[in-house]
Amino acid sequence: MRPRRTSTRLVLTAAALGIRAASTALPADALRLASSLYMLSSPPQLVALVTGGGAQLAPWLLATPGASNSILEFSVPYAKASLAAVLGHDPPQSVNAAVAESMAERAYERSVALGGGERSVGLGCTAALRSEPMRRGEHRCYIAVRSAAGVHCLALTLAKGARSREAEDAVVARAALATLARACGVNPPPLPGGGPFWKLASDDPLAPEVAARLDAEHADETFVAT
């Protein structure tokens, strides 16, 4: 007589495992701006390369309806060797305008190779943000967007110590999205308080000295036609 076989199905929920559900809320204004890009008569055919910060840009772009008609590829060459492989050389310093422009150029070439044609757009973003232990130098990012028209660049210096790492990353993602939008002829809306689209407040109530540092933040933007 064959032995009887039994099976038990165990279903574990996140709550049973003690795992807290992460918030999936995405900034509505960022999604609206991404949607504006996708609704263009000729939406950009985007390849993006991001390292060091600004990775929150990926879910903002990909969670917006219409992404499949515009986003070709989004990559994060985070390791030094990975970035060197993308650029074709190992830069002595990875967070500067030249690296951002090289990343944008490689991304643009990739978009062309994937069939983007005249709508090909390449975005490069490199950043140095809050870390543990605290970083010695400035918290900053460099963003470049390459299109058939030319190269749009943004250099942004953040107020050191005013934000969490997550908030700094969101600022960089916003700056990248705003630069991309302007390169495509879409003006990003200002924040409700009248500040630039990329700017975010500190996680905690702002002390006067923190507010002053945030007010002192600056961004330098340039465009060079091809």
Walk through the language-model features, giving the residues of each.
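Non-catalytic propeptide/linker segments at domain boundaries
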Residues: 188-226
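Terminal signal-anchor or tail-anchor transmembrane helices
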Residues: 4-21
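Short alpha-helical segments enriched in small residues
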Residues: 24-198
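Glycine-centered flexibility motif
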Residues: 4, 54, 216-217
